[in-house]
């Protein structure tokens, strides 16, 4: 079995994601491992640093920026409207949960 691993810059733009999709679309069985998109890990580290410094507003801004980035990817990559809506709803739900937890941190740190 073939294992294909793609790092963050390999999936960092819509064009690169499409290229990876072409590479893995062949019918032979394989395991595909994808890293977070380029910059995502850095964003998460910045969010964690903001939370550590109790800068909830800055953390909220960074989370929202990351959310919009993922929504942009979904809008550009997905052509089927139903699939696109489902993906965006999933992204919105996950980020809303994150923001809800952020509100709890803010509430308990006062």
What kind of region is each of these model predictions?
Residues 1-110:
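Nucleotide/pyrophosphate-binding catalytic subdomain
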